[in-house]
Amino acid sequence: MGRSAFGSRTRMTAFVDLAARLAAEPADAALKDVVLTIAETCAQISRVVASGALSGSLGAAGSTNVQDEEQKKLDVITNDMLSDALKACGPVAGLASEELEEVEPTGRVGGYLVTFDPLDGSSNIDVNVSVGTIFSVLPAPAGHAPTEGDFLQPGRNQVAAGYAVYGPQTMLVVTLSGGVNGFTLSADGRWLLTHPDLAIKPDTAEFAINMSNQRHWAPAVRRYIDGCLQGKDGARGKNFNMRWVASMVADVHRIMMRGGVFMYPWDAREPDKPGKLRLMYEANPMSLLAERAGGKSIEGLNEILDINPAKLHQRVPVVLGSANEVEVIRAEMRAG
């Protein structure tokens, strides 16, 4: 063992790598191949993100995506990286990206379908704030090439889900067979298990929400946040802290590490839209991770994982995190 620049001993050999950890999972070998392909691509994306302006990859791409949002150059680059890798992965029958209007069959039948947000929080990339990649894996139909309808499965059908967060460290958080595990990308490009069996604390005094939208919220959301802001002098009897990064990956990762609730509710700015976040690319995979880590995830009254999708780019409101606090919010929603 050597010493780092700070004098502490390095013990990289003490950590289990992703391939070895997946080998211990009871999941299908083909599914493990899909997860490894995504993980390897996320490691490559991490290097591209880290190079920033040095590679000329910052700034706008001069185009919009299917959501009519301005694309960053890295949105396009990372989407192409994941799309190319998954098309070359044998068990993948089809893929769908937040950045693309239609699903992309690979020409194969059976195996798995993958949905992904290639660079969540990309509006932060030019100011060097954490961004990430979110992915979901679903079973593919056995008898035909997949169509859009085959992707429209409830979140409980997911066979794997995860995200990579590109921050001070690059981490991969993933679930396959039941538990949730966190891996850190080493300097030599290996995913090493540093956070086994992640669990979200059931109680919290921390919430994540965009307070600038307060005047547009439904009464139940305003009541809940007002109660938090009253602190120990109010009915809740304790002080709360607020955190908001405007990158779902970063905000949810903090909750996975230390508890809290993430809220992106419906608001009156666009009353005909049920929410901002995409069910298939963001809400479903994050909800599976949250539930398997002991947390909860609801759209207001009901569990997000029970939603039957109506369309590929469907949006939903999201309340996710510490189980007991999510129930407090659900009770406010029931009160109207």
UniProtKB/Swiss-Prot annotation:
GO terms for biological process: fructose 1,6-bisphosphate metabolic process; fructose 6-phosphate metabolic process; fructose metabolic process; gluconeogenesis; sucrose biosynthetic process. Substrate binds at D120, G121, S122, S123, N210, K276. GO terms for molecular function: fructose 1,6-bisphosphate 1-phosphatase activity; magnesium ion binding. InterPro entries: FBPase_C_dom, FBPase_class-1, FBPase_N, FBPtase. The keyword Ribonucleoprotein does not apply. Mg(2+) 1 binds at E98, D117, L119. The keyword Cytoplasm applies. This is Fructose-1,6-bisphosphatase class 1. It comes from Caulobacter vibrioides (strain ATCC 19089 / CIP 103742 / CB 15) (Caulobacter crescentus). The lineage of its organism: Bacteria, Pseudomonadati, Pseudomonadota, Alphaproteobacteria, Caulobacterales.
